[in-house]
C-alpha cells in the first residue's frame, strides 16, 4: 500500500512539474522592455471621458479646445504615457471617449488629464480606474502607424 501511495504521489508531482511549461514563443527581452509580468500583463490606468458640464462654449471655443485636445493626445502618445485613445460611438451614457494611460497610479493619470484643454474647460469629465491588461498594448501605436494612410 505504501509503495502504491508513493508511486501515485510521484506521478502527481511529475504531472505538476510538466504542466508548468514555459511558452516557447516567450521573448524575455521584449517582456522586460514592456515591463511585463510573468503573464505578459502590466498595470495601466483606464479613463472614461464623459460629457462635461460646460454647455456654453461657442463653436469657435469648442474647435480650439478640440484642437488642443487632439494635440495633447498626440503629445502624450509620443511620450509613451498614452497607449490608447479613441471616441465612443453615440450612446445614452454620455461617454465620449477613452484613454488608457501607461502609468501605475491614479495620481499620475490625474496629472496627465489635467494637461487636456477640453478637460480643463469642463467639456469632458473623467473617471479613472486602475486596469490590468496586456503589456503588448504598448506596441499598438507602432502598428497603427503602419496601417494609417492619412
What spans do the regions from the language model cover?
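Conserved, structured core segments of small domains
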Residues: 20-150
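Bacterial Sec-dependent N-terminal signal peptides
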Residues: 1-22
Amino acid at each position: 500500500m505504501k509503495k502504491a501511495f508513493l508511486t501515485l504521489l510521484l506521478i502527481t508531482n511529475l504531472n505538476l512539474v510538466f504542466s508548468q511549461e514555459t511558452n516557447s514563443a516567450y521573448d524575455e527581452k521584449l517582456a522586460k522592455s514592456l515591463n511585463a509580468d510573468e503573464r505578459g500583463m502590466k498595470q495601466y490606468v483606464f479613463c472614461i471621458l464623459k460629457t462635461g458640464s460646460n454647455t456654453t462654449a461657442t463653436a469657435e471655443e469648442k474647435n480650439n479646445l478640440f484642437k488642443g485636445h487632439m494635440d495633447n493626445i498626440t503629445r502624450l502618445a509620443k511620450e509613451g504615457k498614452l497607449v490608447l485613445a479613441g471616441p465612443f460611438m453615440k450612446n445614452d451614457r454620455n461617454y465620449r471617449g477613452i484613454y488608457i494611460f501607461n502609468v501605475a497610479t491614479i495620481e499620475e493619470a490625474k496629472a496627465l488629464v489635467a494637461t487636456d484643454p477640453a478637460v480643463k474647460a469642463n467639456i469632458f469629465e473623467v473617471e479613472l480606474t486602475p486596469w490590468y491588461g496586456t503589456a503588448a498594448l504598448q506596441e499598438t501605436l507602432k502598428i497603427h502607424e503602419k496601417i494609417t494612410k492619412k
